[in-house]
């Protein structure tokens, strides 16, 4: 199930199923959170107190923006899709990457890949929709499993070669 939340600094967000967000109190000067799983965040702007997220062995520094962040431990990667504003991603002290709106960053096995993305596809779950745009069937199965808390089995290995385009709406 999805859970909406508000933090004392004005930041709002939605946690996806199977996700956990934690932070220390008081949450004012040090705006640091830890995330396991997936969250859509609308971070309140405060230039004097940057918002920092630790997820999947990386740090995401935010000044005020909205974006989707996915870092499920079992999936072994971090994915950020920026809707508006800017974020700074780092996996180590010497590697810092700035992101702009409509960019997608994936951090996996020590490698960072950045590409152009449609934020609507990655943020649709917040409105109760799963959107697929030519996604591999293994990815479709994984997201449906998490969304509905069920096990999906592709009956034939040949299906993994195909992609899927469509939208599931949760009424």
Range-by-range predicted roles:
Residues 1-171:
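A residue-level detector for the "anchor" residue at the start of short, highly conserved motifs
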């Amino acid at each position: 199930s999805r859970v909406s939340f508000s933090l004392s600094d004005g930041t709002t967000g939605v946690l996806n199923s199977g996700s956990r967000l934690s932070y220390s109190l008081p949450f004012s000067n040090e705006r640091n959170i830890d995330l396991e799983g997936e969250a859509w965040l609308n971070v309140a702007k405060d230039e004097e107190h940057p918002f920092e997220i630790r997820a999947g062995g990386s740090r995401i520094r935010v000044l005020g923006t909205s974006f989707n962040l996915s870092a499920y431990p079992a999936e072994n990667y971090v994915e950020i899709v920026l809707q508006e504003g800017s974020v700074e991603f780092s996996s180590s002290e010497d590697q810092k990457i700035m992101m702009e709106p409509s960019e997608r960053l994936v951090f996996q096995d020590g490698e960072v890949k950045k590409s152009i993305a449609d934020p609507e596809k990655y943020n649709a779950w917040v409105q109760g929709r799963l959107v697929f745009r030519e996604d591999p069937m293994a990815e479709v199965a994984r997201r449906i499993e998490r969304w509905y808390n069920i096990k999906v089995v592709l009956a034939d290995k040949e299906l993994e070669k195909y992609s899927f385009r469509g939208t599931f709406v949760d009424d």
